[in-house]
């Protein structure tokens, strides 16, 4: 079943501008309180100007352009401007540091970067130290450094016409984005996302929360994440609704933003719910228009009930990952919800629980959650330049192995049991244990290292490092945490350190992580 009808993203935006015209499409609020608003017509014009900017800088169909930005209008302009000319967006997690960002640049083959002044010094260092393919950097800030190969995004964009100058042939099978996501291996993998994937995500996610053109969808989720892009932005735009993008989450400001913009739909992760609950109660807690709060794992029933009662909302559970593009299992609009179930499989998908031999399990038995979709359409196409990793998780007939465990009941409701192997869920970020262990192992005093996730009342899981030192060495907590802060993103830095004489291992020599939790 083809619900896209051959419509790529360029056609989508041209149609949206024609149909919705002066209706508000996008509202962006910065951390400083600056608000920018764009109608569908204005937003399409900004997207066209941005596409023309990239064309003048030599970007053509198939070229990769990296974005290292916080939530801002420029992210939206670039995302769809690149898509209009057949180029490929490579969003970089705005919290990553030098080594991690450089690795993504190198492995994505990005030739141009759009970033802001706060991240520019890091990329100066990367260009000096690493052999990347970067030809040019665009800065979104007004003030520019006196460096060659750097230009002002805003100045260049404003010089461009509002109609598209370069319109190569496009197909819905063309790649629109490569989104690097942490996995169970030591390095992130590039998830290849097509025009069809994004168009489908818009229709599917709009269906999931019954979006209409009079809705206002507010999110504080980072734009470089799949949930902001495919659950929120694509859904809102596909429905002709208004999309509100807040630069950064603030527990103190969030409810006021929901009220100010008269949001009808928003999304929350457990860390947000917990920090909202510790804010002082207010008589305005239920003074809002929210009808759905999209929710992602993992919350106790007591926490859920307390949140819903205090704020007068209901949670719409959704389960998915970058590779599934959308929440392929979830609550359905208008249907009964069965907590703590993660819901039922959505349209265009199949879901099974399978055993270690890849055989389907009956209701009530725990196994791996597996999803069947169409690669490049309803699930990701492949891992970029990594056929071995693709083959490991994606079968030829479209069955995707999530690596997560769960079970289903007799009525088709699914239940999540545990996270995928060696992953830590920390405040909405997926952190690979192996990646951290490889970084920490480079410390000259450390002989052996393992990191595990331990329960945290606010951020789902905290990171604890267990280390064995080289003989005769001593290591202070201050020295250890300073080393981590210098070599990894802040959200990956362990919260706890324990120095041990040895680590528990099985007969194969593998560390038994569960003995350390």
From Swiss-Prot:
Keyword Ligase (UniProt): yes
EC number: 6.2.1.48
A Pfam match: AMP-binding
Keyword set, alphabetical order: Ligase
Catalytic activity, as annotated: 4-(trimethylamino)butanoate + ATP + CoA = 4-(trimethylamino)butanoyl-CoA + AMP + diphosphate; crotonobetaine + ATP + CoA = crotonobetainyl-CoA + AMP + diphosphate; (R)-carnitine + ATP + CoA = (R)-carnitinyl-CoA + AMP + diphosphate
PROSITE patterns documented for this protein: AMP_BINDING
Molecular functions (GO terms): carnitine-CoA ligase activity; crotonobetaine-CoA ligase activity; medium-chain fatty acid-CoA ligase activity
GO biological process: carnitine metabolic process; fatty acid metabolic process
Associated pathway: Amine and polyamine metabolism; carnitine metabolism
Role this protein plays: Catalyzes the transfer of CoA to carnitine, generating the initial carnitinyl-CoA needed for the CaiB reaction cycle. Also has activity toward crotonobetaine and gamma-butyrobetaine.
Family: Belongs to the ATP-dependent AMP-binding enzyme family.
Name used for this protein in its record: Crotonobetaine/carnitine--CoA ligase
Annotated source species: Escherichia coli (strain ATCC 8739 / DSM 1576 / NBRC 3972 / NCIMB 8545 / WDCM 00012 / Crooks)
């Amino acid at each position: 079943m083809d619900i896209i009808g051959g419509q790529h993203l360029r056609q989508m935006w041209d149609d949206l501008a024609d149909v919705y015209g002066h209706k508000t499409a996008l509202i962006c609020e910065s951390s400083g309180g600056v608000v920018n608003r764009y109608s569908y017509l204005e937003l399409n014009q900004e997207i066209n100007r941005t596409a023309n900017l990239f064309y003048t800088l030599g970007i053509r169909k198939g070229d990769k352009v990296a974005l290292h930005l916080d939530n801002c209008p420029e992210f939206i302009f670039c995302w769809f401007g690149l898509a209009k000319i057949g180029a490929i967006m490579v969003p970089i997690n705005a919290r990553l540091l030098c080594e991690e960002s450089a690795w993504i640049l190198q492995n994505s083959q990005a030739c141009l970067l759009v970033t802001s002044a706060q991240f520019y010094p890091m990329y100066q260092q990367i260009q000096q130290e690493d052999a990347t393919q970067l030809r040019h950097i665009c800065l979104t800030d007004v003030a520019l450094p006196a460096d060659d190969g750097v230009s002002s995004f805003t100045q260049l964009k404003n010089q461009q016409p509002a109609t598209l100058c370069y319109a190569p042939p496009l197909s819905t099978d063309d790649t629109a984005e490569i989104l690097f996501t942490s996995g169970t291996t030591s390095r992130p993998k590039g998830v290849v996302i097509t025009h069809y994937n994004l168009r489908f995500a818009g229709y599917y996610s709009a269906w999931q929360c019954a979006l209409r053109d009079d809705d206002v969808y507010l999110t504080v989720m980072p734009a470089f994440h799949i949930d902001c892009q495919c659950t929120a932005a694509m859904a809102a735009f596909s429905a002709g609704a208004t999309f509100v993008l807040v630069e950064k989450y603030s527990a103190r400001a969030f409810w006021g933003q929901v009220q100010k913009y008269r949001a009808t739909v928003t999304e929350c992760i457990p860390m947000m719910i917990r920090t909202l609950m510790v804010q002082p109660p207010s008589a305005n807690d239920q003074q809002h228009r929210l009808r759905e709060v999209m929710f992602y794992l993992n919350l106790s029933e007591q926490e859920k009930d307390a949140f819903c009662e205090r704020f007068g909302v209901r949670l719409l559970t959704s389960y998915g990952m970058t590779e599934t593009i959308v929440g392929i299992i979830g609550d359905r609009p208008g249907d009964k919800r069965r907590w703590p179930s993660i819901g039922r499989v959505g349209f265009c998908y199949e879901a099974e629980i399978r055993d270690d031999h890849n055989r389907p399990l009956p209701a009530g038995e725990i196994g791996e959650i597996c999803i069947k979709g169409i690669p490049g359409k309803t699930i990701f196409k492949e891992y970029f330049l990594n056929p071995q990793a693709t083959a490991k998780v994606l079968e030829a007939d479209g069955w995707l192995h999530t690596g997560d465990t769960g079970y289903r009941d007799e009525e088709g409701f699914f239940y999540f049991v545990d996270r995928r192997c060696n992953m830590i869920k920390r405040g909405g970020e997926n952190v690979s244990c192996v990646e951290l262990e490889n970084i920490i192992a480079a410390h000259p005093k450390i002989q052996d290292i393992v990191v595990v996730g331990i329960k945290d009342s606010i951020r789902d899981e905290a990171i604890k490092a267990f280390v064995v030192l080289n003989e005769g060495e001593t290591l202070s907590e201050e020295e250890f945490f300073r080393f981590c802060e210098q070599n990894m993103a802040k959200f990956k830095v362990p919260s706890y350190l324990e120095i041990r004489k040895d680590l528990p291992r099985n007969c194969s020599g593998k560390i038994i992580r569960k003995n350390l939790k």
